[in-house]
Amino acid sequence: DIISSNIAICQKYGYAITGIKCREAILESEDGFTSTTSIPRDKLIRTQTPQTFRLGNLIAAHEEAKAKGITNSVASCTLMAELGGRQMHVVPGSEKNIKITTIEDLEILKALMKVQPESWLK
């Protein structure tokens, strides 16, 4: 269970990030239209929720970020990476662990709810 694993890892190490290995091909683009660079996926992790932190550590990190002028992090895990020196521990996630933020996410959720595992998939 992802939540229980996050809690256990956070209690042991102070941070827990849910993530899955990247399977997609990743390109880097400066303009969003063209690319001449690919990023090797073997070291990439796609983060998911939940992300679990000890409250004191998280508050201290946000205060440090504010003092350093870091204001554009997209998530707590990226903030920790930008601050540096914080080793985050990854808890295995799932492709079915989707975050609902867009209409497309809702459509994916609806499709997942309709799927019945076939016996050959077990």
Predicted regions and their residues:
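Conserved beta-loop-beta/alpha segment of the NTase-like Rossmann-fold superfamily
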Residues: 1-30, 48
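Short secondary-structure boundary/capping segments
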Residues: 7-8, 35-37, 80, 89
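Solvent-exposed alpha-helices and their adjacent loops that cap or buttress functional pockets
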Residues: 9-10, 37-38, 71-72, 92
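Intrinsically disordered, low-complexity segments enriched in polar/charged residues with Gly/Pro
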Residues: 13-14, 38-39, 85-87
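Short, flexible, basic/aromatic active-site loop/helix in glycosyltransferases
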Residues: 27-51
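Conserved alpha/beta core of the MobA/IspD/sugar-nucleotide pyrophosphorylase nucleotidyltransferase superfamily
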Residues: 45-122
